[in-house]
Amino acid sequence: MARVKRAVNAHKKRRTVLKASKGYRGQRSRLYRKAKEQQLHSLGYAYRDRRARKGEFRKLWISRINAAARANDITYNRLIQGLKAADVDVDRKNLADIAISDPAAFTALVEVARSGLPEDVNVPSGEAA
């Protein structure tokens, strides 16, 4: 049986890993074993952070909506509660975009939310009967 020589495949595999690890620091960009370990970790971090990014954007949108809502004398949770009660179906991404790009439209949405809230909710906490 003929001997199988794998030098070409092995070098190709190593070259691919080292090419992908370009930009890493120290041995992790020069030594195959270290580069391979770092690449495995990097892929795991990328997978994790693609999912974490979605939550981070949601936090950003909520912060923007809350800032714009407070400028209109209503809190974020009252705004969302009022919009749901008024059957306004707008997601947080679009609501944040409206708050930044079109303040007049956002103010109109705030008024719709206020009309959707029950009467006792609109009274400030210090003046409740």
UniProtKB/Swiss-Prot annotation:
This protein's UniProt keywords: Ribonucleoprotein, Ribosomal protein, RNA-binding, rRNA-binding
Listed GO CC annotations: ribonucleoprotein complex; ribosome
Keyword NAD assigned: no
Molecular function per GO: rRNA binding; structural constituent of ribosome
One Pfam family per UniProt: Ribosomal_L20
A GO biological process held by the record: ribosomal large subunit assembly
Domain of life of the native organism: Bacteria
NCBIfam families linked to this entry: rplT_bact (TIGR01032)
Record's function text: Binds directly to 23S ribosomal RNA and is necessary for the in vitro assembly process of the 50S ribosomal subunit. It is not involved in the protein synthesizing functions of that subunit.
Family membership: Belongs to the bacterial ribosomal protein bL20 family.
Protein name, entry field: Large ribosomal subunit protein bL20
Lineage, opening ranks: Bacteria, Bacillati, Actinomycetota, Actinomycetes, Mycobacteriales
